[in-house]
Amino acid sequence: YSGRVLTEKETLKRYLQQAREALLWKLDGVSERDARWPMTPTGTNLLGIVKHVASVEIGYFGDIFGRPSGERLPWFADDAPDNADMWATVDESRADIIALYHRSWAHSDRTIDELTLDAPGTVPWWPPESRDVTLHRILVHMIAETARHAGHADIVRELIDGMAGVRADNSNLPDHDATWWAVYVASLQRVAEDAAQCPSPCRRRRSPSKPNGSSSANSRM
């Protein structure tokens, strides 16, 4: 954007794209097995998150504004099993889901570019009092939706292999090695154990002890 002040639509579109890329990056370097492996009691998995976000974005920027994408999404059919959009079948490869998400972006961006922010739409599955929407509202909603799921993916990926960070070129984490992080985590565990023994309200106010080499500039308090 060459340093110029962005329009409101450009700003919203930029934040949406940043959230999309942050989410998709979490699949980089993950095997087909690990991409599908359920990491929580409710089955949260990386590939399922991407499949879900790609699918709902197609709906929000498609049919809602009378601009159907033509994508076939059988996991949203009335007779589909619960949570069918939250996991990928054996026949749906990681490449398939990534390609779906890219097509979703392209279709959504055409809607965003061609409509005004006050363009009306209707979300039939929302409550009657709130289902009449504008493109502006759906953009904000989709930014929040994507960012929320990118956060889920961030934690899931860290649980899989320890990879963490906002995006490939900026982890947004203090620059320390695995030893430092192990000491840091151990210090938090000690604080948690101390807090469990502390009466409520706790009279002792303790902060985690800083591992060697930490500084106030990069500590995450």
Model-derived regions: residue spans:
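Low-acidity, Ser/Thr- and Arg-rich intrinsically disordered low-complexity segments
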Residues: 200-220
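Short, contiguous alpha-helical
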Residues: 1-2, 9, 13-28, 32-82, ...
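Long, charge-rich low-complexity segments
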Residues: 92-113, 189-203
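Conserved, well-structured core segments that form or line functional sites
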Residues: 117
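Short, charged, low-complexity loops and linkers
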Residues: 1-12, 86-92, 96
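Helix-adjacent hinge/juxtasegments
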Residues: 71-107
